[in-house]
Amino acid sequence: MEYSNSSPYEEQLRKHVNKISEGSYDNIKDIIKYPNQISLKILRILIEYACLGQNIAPIELARKKIKEIDSGWLNNFIPQVAQMCICFEDEWEYRRLLELIEEAAPEFIKMGNFSRN
């Protein structure tokens, strides 16, 4: 199904997410109700779009979708999923991950501010 106000990038992301679980893109808040096997695959797709690409449009689309997810659930699973798909030695990927965390899970930044490092 084509959405009239969607960009080609959004259509691509929607298709990728909905391939895991039909209708998930438009109901992303329900991700917390899915079995972990499904919800973590969807979160991985979103993190990859938000951190691996070079084009700002899909990066921002994925960030926007991630911010729609319950923050408590997100805080529990972002570290686990990020370790599966982000190369922490790659400066680009790591910077995009930090930007994502600053927008979607700022609690991690706050925790770092209170560390002794």
Describe each PLM feature range.
Residues M1, E11-I20:
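DNA-contacting interfaces and partner/effector-binding or oligomerization modules
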Residues M1-S4, E22-Q37, I59-G72, E91-A104:
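Structural detector for internal amphipathic alpha-helices that build alpha-solenoid repeat scaffolds
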Residues S6-R14, Q37-Y49, S71-M84, P106-R116:
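Amphipathic alpha-helical scaffolding segments comprising HEAT/armadillo-like alpha-solenoid repeats
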Residues L40, Q54-P58:
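Short active-site-adjacent helix-start/loop capping segments
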Residues Q80-C85, W92-R96:
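Short acidic, glycine/Ser/Thr-rich loop/turn "cap" segments at secondary-structure junctions
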Residues A50-Q54, C85-E89:
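Structural signature of alpha-solenoid helical repeat scaffolds
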